[in-house]
Each structure stands twice: as C-alpha cells, then as structure tokens.
Amino acid sequence: ELFAYTIRLLESCTLSDRVGFALMAFAPVDLRLKAFVVTWAIHYGKLTADGLIKCPIPLTRNNRCLVANASPVSTDNALKRWKEEGAWIRDGDFVTFPAAFVDDAYQWMRSAEESSEYTYPNTFRELLEALPPLTNPWY
C-alpha cells in the first residue's frame, strides 16, 4: 500500500511545477480545472469497469477559483457546461466522469514535459489502469 501511494505521489510530482506555471499562463479555464481533476483523480479516483472515474468532490467553490486562478463566474460556467454535456455527474459527496473527459488536459500536460526514455500511457484511463490500486476507505 505504501508503494502504491509513493508511485502516485511521484506521478503527481512529475505533473506539478513547470506544467502548473504553463497552465496558469496559457490555458483556458476549462483546461486548468481539468488539469486539477487529473491530479485529484490520481490520488482519490477509482476507475470503474465502464471507464468512468469516481472520486470525492474535488474542491469548494472558493478553493476551485484559487486553484484555477479564475473568477467564480468562469469556474461556475465551466462546471455548468460539463454537467449539461453529461460529463460531470454529481452523486452526493462524489463526482463521476468519463476518463476520456480529461484526456485533453492529460495530453497537454504530457506534451509539456521533457523527453525521456520512459513512455507514459497515451490516455488518462491507461494511466489509471497502470497505477497500483489503492484501498480507499471512501468507497
């Protein structure tokens, strides 16, 4: 279990500093929010058999605005669009979304990295399938 948490922590570290600065400078609000959802899902998400990711609601409205460096109106509009598209389904304290929904953010984050010998999975779903499973008390 400690090994699984360590792998997930290292995965988040590779997605952090340079990518975070680039996102804040160049990405639209939707992509900034999805990038956060990617890192949140790495730590707290559970991939279901039908390709959906279920995780606890990521943030309060206030914190969502701080993380995305965006106004409440911008973040509210993004979430409203996601819900209308059926991509962001809230169920109590959890949210469910298709793994492919965040692929644009995942791919953008990966393209911003330096090249290396390690080949990352092409899709976010493939990444979650490759990570060691966590036994999470929330589920």
Regions found by a protein language model. Give the residues of each.
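Short alpha-helical segments that sit at the start of domains
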Residues: 19-46
